[in-house]
Amino acid sequence: MKIHYFQRYHAKENVATANTMLLLSRLYQYSTDKFFRFLNSLVFPENFEPEIVFRLQEKSSNSVPDATITQESFKIVVETKLSDWFYTDQLERHLSSFENEKQKILLTLAPEYMEAEKQKNFESKLAVYNESLENPIRHINTTFEELVNRIQEAIDDRDYEMQEVVEDYLNYCYHD
């Protein structure tokens, strides 16, 4: 489903998800470098480069093409709640959303971190699920505030347009 500029949802959880995706898409449109810097700080391991890479004369096993343009595959599946009320069975069903991506991230997002015992329970089930996968799924649990903090680290004070978008998002988070 397309991310619209103005959300069309009535359920508060869906509004929060739509507004968060709009914030992230605005960051991407503003600066892909800053978007990928944000992603690297929040979800990707240090050795992962999600940016498009241009190479000349890259050798393969049987040839040397003139040039290649590549981007490592990744997928981030997001589950948003307005409390830490995540359901393990729902999160387990979300695992089937992944296919052959190199980096697979299940991002749980809420105003507060997931309760420790609940997170431990889900992550033990995830570990069993991952045993059969070549590229395991990683679970990242974070908050709206941490998401904003990471975006603010990726942009600087001169990014007035993006600062305004982030400020509006924070206003939404604290007042709606």
Predicted regions and their residues:
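Charged, terminal alpha-helix-loop-beta segments
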Residues: 1-176
